[in-house]
């Protein structure tokens, strides 16, 4: 299992992210971040719930 930094802890609703393993999902907007489970609505894939302990989402500051 990859080592995940605590960067997911800063993700808040409205922030933009990308999934590091699925760039084809496109830009995603964080819907919620509760107990390390991050709900993201991806432009090309729809709504996904990401386990923040396993996947380090990539924040996007300048889309």
What are these regions (language model features)?
Residues 1-16, 24:
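Mixed-charge, Lys/Arg-rich low-complexity intrinsically disordered regions
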Residues 1-3, 47-63:
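Intrinsically disordered, low-complexity, charged/polar segments
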Residues 26-32:
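Short beta-strand-centered aromatic/proline hotspots
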Residues 33, 43:
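Short, loop-centered acidic/histidine patches that primarily coordinate divalent metals
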Residues 38-42:
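SH3/SH3-like beta-barrel fold
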């Amino acid at each position: 299992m990859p080592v995940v930094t605590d960067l997911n802890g800063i993700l808040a609703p409205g922030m933009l992210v990308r999934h590091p393993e699925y760039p084809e999902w496109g830009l995603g907007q964080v819907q919620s971040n509760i107990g390390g489970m991050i709900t993201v609505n991806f432009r090309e894939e729809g709504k996904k719930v990401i386990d923040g302990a396993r996947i380090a989402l990539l924040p996007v500051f300048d889309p």
